Amino acid sequence: MTMLLTAEEVKQLALKESGELAGVAAVNTFPTSVPSRPPQAVLPGAKSVIAYGIPMLLGSISSNPRVAASHTKTVYDELNRIGYQVGRLLERAGYHAATVGSFFPLEMSKETRGLVGDLSFRHAAVAAGLGVWSRCRLVLNPRWGPRVRYAAVVTDAPLASDSPSEEELCADCDLCIRACPVGALSTEGTVDTIKCLLQVQQYGQPGFSRFLRDLVAKPIEEQQQALRQPLFWNLYQHLAMGIDYECSRCLEACPVGL
């Protein structure tokens, strides 16, 4: 038996739990991401997606990579906590709810190469009216620009949906494109995901794989020496943290919300 639960009650809980943004998108109008990750694949019978977001601290993401990565992990942990509370509210009312991890785990397959989550939080945020697309496929919020991390809860509760924003926020200033140190962003609006990944996650899975490949080819003495080098220490630290972000240049450069 289900209890009456309004979209406003659900959004207010997300805001009360320290989220700054919350909105609802209907599953039947949910935009298609590439590759397709429909909400029904997360929860069969899904009717609504509750998207919510937390702004990042500009001082933290503009600091050194250690401070920025630690801050990002803090925000992701908070997003997971909020999602669980929203899910509990929905299930206490008799509905089903599924939270999607804000970072890991990801599908590790030949098809996705660990680049695709079970649900696109950016598409959820845009569909729920929390932001609009930028030229380089960041989600822009009028108050915080692209400096917001999003997450979502999928539910079979038939909640009233919000309308996508029609506000034009991206001025095509090219500041994000010029700020990218590896040229991953283009004026045509495309993103070279691999270039971006190798810059953002220098000590992530690609870097770890290269280290192992090179390590096994070395003589035993050189292997032992490699384990006493800062490269291995950084790889270990990032594996232990479970998160790896070494670059926020495009987020810092965007003038929206500053």
Question: Model regions: which residues?
Answer:
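Non-catalytic, usually N-terminal nucleic-acid engagement modules in DNA/RNA processing proteins
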Residues: 1-81
